Swiss-Prot record:
Positions of post-translational Phosphoserine modification: 276
Protein species of origin: Saccharomyces cerevisiae (strain YJM789)
Chain positions recorded as Ca(2+) binding sites: 53, 55, 57, 59, 64
Alphabetized InterPro entries for the sequence: EF-hand-dom_pair, EF_Hand_1_Ca_BS, EF_hand_dom, EH_dom, End3
Domain of life the protein comes from: Eukaryota
Lineage per the UniProt record: Eukaryota, Fungi, Dikarya, Ascomycota, Saccharomycotina
Name of the protein described by the UniProt record: Actin cytoskeleton-regulatory complex protein END3
Coiled coil segments of this chain: 307-349
Pfam families, sorted: EH, End3
Biased composition (Basic and acidic residues): 236-248
PROSITE patterns the UniProt entry points to: EF_HAND_1, EF_HAND_2, EH
Gene: END3
GO biological process terms held by the UniProt record: actin filament organization; endocytosis; endosomal transport
Length: 349
């Protein structure tokens, strides 16, 4: 690390004067633009600020400002690979030597009094206050058309709030709560992303290697894709319809067979399927079966000719439903492409 030159000190004085110091000191907010323009990790910048603020008053006089700027430039220009734990002697101003010695003594005493450091684990429980705070951060983020948030958007937002986390921390937690490596995540994983990083920032909690099973299910939840080229399997609506159709088939078979054993067998089969369904599926199934009952009643009263007409109408209705679903997918796909086109045009302009 080369020593300070006179031209450097003049350059730092020009920058210092431009910040409009009060009583020959600048505070953290005044220096903040310079810190962020360096593109260094917040953990690195915090360590530089701590080393430079020798008198621990949360302000920098000119001598301390010179230390701060020199360490930043050395890191940016790769003159040093990491911030030193202590200032080199040639960078300590003569007026600050005694303060440095006092700081070292305090640190030795504090370290001697500290109990052995225990590993802090992430607590995944979120209190109502936590949820309110995370909701505000979530609402302040720019979202994609499907309501999800990208890594860059979240990391930029959190870097202005959590100063003790590094880019490595951000990447680790993103991989943890995004095991499918999706380009963006929705609301629930976003909350867990913020919650984990907050404990890392405030408590120094260790980032876990895996999620609890209950959280893994939330973070592994698949997002609905509107890309027509996607190989995503059919939606849940179709799966539920298939289950109801299977139950309807069982009902039709039982009505065509008068034997008590077949009826009992079909009844047990229906009960087993019924027990495995969710509330939404049960409601959907009930609606379908009531429709089937009404259909059977009308079949007996109106005869075979009207039956064939109703079957044809049902077939046409199903076709219309399928076409309607395809139109919705195409409209969403068109809207996404329009947004992409607008973004490209904005970049060109």
């Amino acid at each position: 690390m080369p020593k300070l030159e006179q031209f450097e000190i003049k350059k730092y004085w020009q920058i210092f004067s431009g910040l409009k110091p009060i009583e020959n000191k600048v505070n953290h907010d005044q220096v903040l633009p310079i810190l962020y323009n360096s593109k260094l990790d917040s953990s690195v910048l915090n360590k530089i600020w701590f080393l430079a603020d020798i008198d621990d008053d949360d302000n920098l006089d000119f001598e301390e400002f010179v230390i701060c700027m020199r360490l930043i430039f050395d890191m940016v220009n790769k003159n040093i690979s990491s911030v030193p734990d202590e200032l080199p002697d040639w960078l300590i101003p003569g007026s600050k030597v005694n303060l440095i010695k006092e700081r070292k003594k305090r640190k030795q005493i504090e370290n001697a009094d500290l109990p052995p450091k225990k590993e802090i684990k992430v607590d995944w429980y979120m209190s109502p206050d936590d949820l309110n705070q995370y909701e505000k951060i979530y609402n302040s983020c720019a979202k994609l058309t499907d309501g999800t948030i990208t890594f860059n958007e979240l990391s930029t937002k959190l870097s202005t709030k959590f100063f003790n986390i590094s880019k490595t921390d951000l990447n680790k937690v993103w991989s943890l709560i995004n095991p499918q490596n999706l380009p963006s995540i929705d609301r629930d994983p976003t909350f867990y992303f913020i919650h984990c990083l907050r404990q890392r920032n405030d408590l120094g909690a260790e980032i876990p290697a895996s999620l609890p099973n209950s959280l893994a299910e939330v973070c592994n939840k698949k997002q609905l894709s509107y890309d027509l080229r996607s190989s995503q399997p059919p939606t849940k609506r179709k799966e539920e319809a298939n289950e109801v159709d299977n139950l309807r088939d069982n009902g039709q078979n039982s009505s065509s067979d008068n034997s008590g054993s077949n009826v009992l067998s079909n009844e047990n089969s229906i009960k087993q399927k019924y027990a495995s369904l969710t509330d939404d599926q049960v409601a959907n199934m009930r609606e379908q079966l009531e429709g089937l009952l009404n259909y059977k009643k009308s079949e007996k009263t109106q005869g075979g000719s009207k039956l064939s007409k109703r079957i044809n109408i049902r077939s046409i209705t199903d076709d219309l439903d399928n076409i309607e679903q395809q139109v919705e997918v195409l409209e969403n796909y068109l809207n996404n492409k329009r947004h992409e086109l607008q973004a490209l045009q904005a970049e060109i302009n």
